[in-house]
Amino acid sequence: MLSIGMLLLLFGMFREKYASSDSASEATQTNVEQVGKVKNIIFIIGDGMGPNQINLVGDSANNFERSHSIGFSKTYSASHRVTDSAAGGTALACGVKTNNGVLGMNADSVPVQSIMQELRQSGLATGEVASCRITHATPAAFYAHQVNRGMDAEILSDLYKYGPDVFVAGGNKLISTDSLQNAGYQVTYSLDSMANIADGKVACILAEEDMPTSPMRGDTIAQGVLQTLRLLEKNEKGFFLFIEGSQIDWAGHGNEGERLRAEMKDINRVIGVCMDYADQHPGTLVFITADHETGGLSLPNEELTPTFSTGSHSGVMVPFFAYGTGADKLTGIHENTDFKALLLSLVDCR
C-alpha cells in the first residue's frame, strides 16, 4: 500500500511538473479562473483505478496529465476498511458512508439523494455512460436506493422512476423496453440510431449484459459520451454526466495485465474527449476519480509489467483529478464523501 508520505510526494511531483506549463495551458487556466460558476459537470469514475493503473496509459497523450489539479480520496466504507463498488459509488454519488453492498442509502438504510438527483431537481439535464450494464453497482449508485446491490428487479424499478435523462450502457437482458417507454424514454440499440434522435429522454442499450472488453468494443464509450453530450447540452441550465470505465475493475479482479492496460487506454481516450469538450464549452468541470483500487497493482521493473498482490479490492487511497471551470477548488486529501457537497457548491444554478 502507498503510504501518506508517498502520496504527498506524488502530489508534490505533479504540482511541480505542471506548475510551469506552456503558454496555451496557462491561457486555459486563466480562462478557467475567469468563468466562475460551473454550468456542466462531467463526473468520471475509473472503477478500480489506483495510482499505478494510471501509469499503464503511458507517457504519450496521457490526458490525466492535462489536469489542472489533483488530490487523493479515502475509500473505506462504513462497514469495511476495504470498500466494494456499491458503498464506494454511494459515497461519491450521495456524500455518505454506507455498508458494503448498499446503494444510495446511508449506513442505517435511509435513502439519500445523489448529486445527480439533486441537480435534476435544480433543472439540469442528467446522463450516464458506462461499459457495464446500467444496473451495475456504480452507475446504480447515482439513481437507486436499495439495501443490496444484487436486487436487480428493485434497481430496475428505480431506473424507470429515477434514472438519468439519457443513458448509454448494457443490460438489455434485464431491461423492459415497455417500462422504459412508459417512463418516457426513446429506446435505441445503436449509436447510429441514437444520432437520429434530436432531444428528449433516451436509453441507448448496446449489449445484452455488459459491453465487450477493450479493445473489442472500439471507441464505443467515447462515441457514446459525444452522443450523450449532444443531447444534454440542449438544456440551457446545464447538465450532469456520469461516466464509468467499469471494466478496469474486472481486469484487476482477474489479474489480467494487458486487459487492464487496454481498459486504461480506453478511459484515457474518454477523458480526452471530455477535456476537449470543456475547452470548447466554458463553465464545464471534468472531475475524475475511482471508487477504490483493484488488484493491489505494482509495476516492478523497467517494462512496467503489471504485477498483482490480490484478486480483490485494496484499501489504498485513490487519486482524483479536475479540469476546467472550478478545478482549482478541488485539491488535497479528502474523504470520498466530500465530493458531492464540493461539486454542488460550484454549480451556477444553486
Pin down the residues of each PLM region:
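N-terminal catalytic scaffold of extracellular/periplasmic and nuclease hydrolases
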Residues: Y18-G171, S176-M194, G200, E293-R350
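Bacterial Sec-dependent N-terminal signal peptides
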Residues: M1-A24
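Gly-rich Lys/Arg/Thr-decorated short loops/hinges at beta-loop-alpha junctions or inter-strand turns
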Residues: G95-N99, A203-T213, D249-G254, F321-A322
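Metal-dependent active-site segment of extracytoplasmic phospho-/sulfohydrolases and closely related
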Residues: P51, K265-E302
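Active-site His/acidic residue clusters
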Residues: A137-Y143, E208-M211, R217, V225-L229, ...
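Active-site proximal loops enriched in glycine and acidic residues that flank catalytic Cys/His/Asp
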Residues: I243-Q247, G252-G254, M264, I288-T294, ...
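Functional beta-strand-loop-alpha-helix junction segments that form "active/interaction loops"
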Residues: N106, T188-V225
